[in-house]
C-alpha cells in the first residue's frame, strides 16, 4: 500500500496486481 507501481488504474485495473499491486487513489501501489 505505500510503494507506487508506476501504473494508474483510472480506466483499467492494475495489471501489476499479479505482483501484488492494488488500486488506491487511481494509482497502483504495493504493500
From Swiss-Prot:
Any one Pfam family match given in the protein's UniProt record, by short name: Cyclotide
The UniProt record lists the keyword Nucleotide-binding: no
InterPro entries, A to Z: Cyclotide (IPR005535), Cyclotide_bracelet_CS (IPR012323), Cyclotide_sf (IPR036146)
Comment, domains: The presence of a 'disulfide through disulfide knot' structurally defines this protein as a knottin.
Name of the protein this chain belongs to: Cyclotide mech-6
Post-translational modification: This is a cyclic peptide.
Keyword Disulfide bond appears in the UniProt entry: yes
Family indicated by similarity: Belongs to the cyclotide family. Bracelet subfamily.
Biological processes annotated in GO: defense response
Disulfide bonds: 5-21, 9-23, 14-28
Protein's job: Probably participates in a plant defense mechanism (Potential). Binds to and induces leakage in phospholipd membranes, particularly ones containing 1-palmitoyl-2-oleophosphatidylethanolamine (POPE).
Numbered residues of crosslink Cyclopeptide (Gly-Asn): 1-31
Keywords tagged on the record: Disulfide bond, Knottin, Plant defense
Amino acid at each position: 500500500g505505500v510503494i507506487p507501481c508506476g501504473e494508474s488504474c483510472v480506466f483499467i485495473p492494475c495489471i501489476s496486481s499479479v505482483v501484488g499491486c492494488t488500486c488506491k487513489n487511481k494509482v497502483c501501489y504495493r504493500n
